[in-house]
Amino acid sequence: MSSVLVTGSTDGIGRETARALVGTGHRVVVHARDERRAVDVRVAVPRAAAIVVGDLASLEETRALAVAADREGPYDSVINNAGVGGTACRETTVDGLELIFQVNVLAPYLLTALMAQPARLVYLTSGLEAQGRIGLDDLQHARGRWDGERAYSDSKLCDVLLAFAVARHWPEVRANAVDPGWIRTRMGGPGATDPLPLGAETPVWLAVSDDPEALVSGSYFKRRRQLRANPAAYDEDLQRALLARCADLTGVTLPR
């Protein structure tokens, strides 16, 4: 039995992932953005070992979440599932940071940097990472005309870079990125082609399986298969630069 933290577990892929893990006998700690959603996830995943609460659109709450989550650990695996989709207009958080970048990139970085190291880290990305571009001087899309889909795609490429950077930084930890597919969730929309259980399958497999194919690090997966990510994700200088920008924006450096 493994102990697993799943962020963003109140609906969609995160909730399905938590249910699948609990259903196969694993100890699961679930995460909700606020107390109201915590009530919902307790109903949805009644056998969860614990619920931790924190809004990933707040650096202060994300730091507190790392502490609260560690109290419920240690973990064999952490699945960084929580995320937000493209927005119609550029939104900023209480920290003055762009919402999509903060929730999708800075929050998993901060949790990774602050929490005790698990044996495995899984970062959910999207097939749209293939369309992403990294502009280190404008990661938060403050310049030019706002494009929510572009901001989302770029954030998902950042998630792949983050997974690969962590894999290199911590060779003793298995860190991988997962494209769950176009899943029928609130974010995926009614036109999505893939059923919800399929979206949870590969994150669960990477988090707990002893299959040799799952015991790797620094890889990009879809449907339990290693695929090639956006070529930019393999740029080690870009990986280091992203870690440095995340450290600057959060005030926390990824420890050795």
Summary of predicted features, one role per range:
Residues 57-73:
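Conserved Rossmann-fold cofactor-binding substructure of NAD(P)-dependent oxidoreductases
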Residues 3-6, 75-79:
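Conserved hydrophobic beta-strands of the Rossmann-like cofactor-binding core
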Residues 45-60:
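Rossmann-fold cofactor-recognition segment
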Residues 177, 193-240, 244:
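C-terminal helical subdomain
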Residues 1-29:
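Canonical Rossmann dinucleotide-binding motif of NAD(H)/NADP(H)-dependent dehydrogenases/reductases
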Residues 24-40:
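Conserved glycine-rich Rossmann-like NAD(P)H-binding loop of the short-chain dehydrogenase/reductase
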Residues 83-84, 88-89, 97-98, 120-172, ...:
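Catalytic loop of short-chain dehydrogenase/reductase
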